[in-house]
Amino acid sequence: MAADQLAGEGYKTLAVVCDVSDDQQVEEMVNKTVAAFGRLDAAYNNAGVQNELADAADQTRQDFDRVTGVNFRGVWSCMKYELQQMRKQGSGAIVNCSSIGGILGGAQRGTYHGAKHGVIGLTKSAALEYASRGIRINTVCPGLIHTAMAEKMIAGGQKEALDAMLQQVPIGRLGRPEEIASAVLWLCSDAASLVVGHTLVIDGGYSIQ
């Protein structure tokens, strides 16, 4: 576990299990973080799930609620409670994870793409509200990244679809999680102090074609 690894290196850590689609759990997560560290300087809202592949007419309400509950409402809920703390401090930085699915369409992935489009709208609106209060909010849009979600797509029989998408990536490879982490750290740092409401696409050139 990452928290255990960091603790072993001498860092103070706190691991909290949280279902981001549950507002009460999200509030408790933020409260526990503030109790442990005294404040909340930065947050990365990264939880996400894929929808079951289906045409729009065949997508189920259950799957829609599951995906939007995590990918859209989850981001909204996390921001809500993070901002309540940052507002008290008068400072902070939030990065929300959208996806290239947030700037493109995707057949049979309407719920996922719709939720990720929504994340960008949430981010821009909140960024306008809080920029003058010392709080910056931005979005990252990762492309094809070697993550557990990609592994699940392969295991679920979508390897051919993933390979076809990868052939369209000009850089010719999957992204690495640490490449996204570096971008998030930059957006949260003082080096990005003028960056507000921005949508940073990190996809190896996939979306510029």
Protein language model features and the residues they cover:
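Substrate-binding pocket helix/loop in short-chain dehydrogenase/reductase
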Residues: 54-56, 60-65, 161, 165
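Short, small/polar-rich loop/turn modules that mediate ligand/substrate recognition or access, typified
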Residues: 39, 131, 136, 195-197
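Residue(s) in the substrate-gating loop at a strand-loop-helix junction
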Residues: 99
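The beta1-alpha1 cofactor-binding region of Rossmann-like NAD(H)/NADP(H)-dependent oxidoreductases
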Residues: 17-29, 61, 178-179
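Short C-terminal tail/terminal secondary-structure segment
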Residues: 50-53, 104, 168, 184-185, ...
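Active-site helix of classical SDR
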Residues: 79, 115, 123
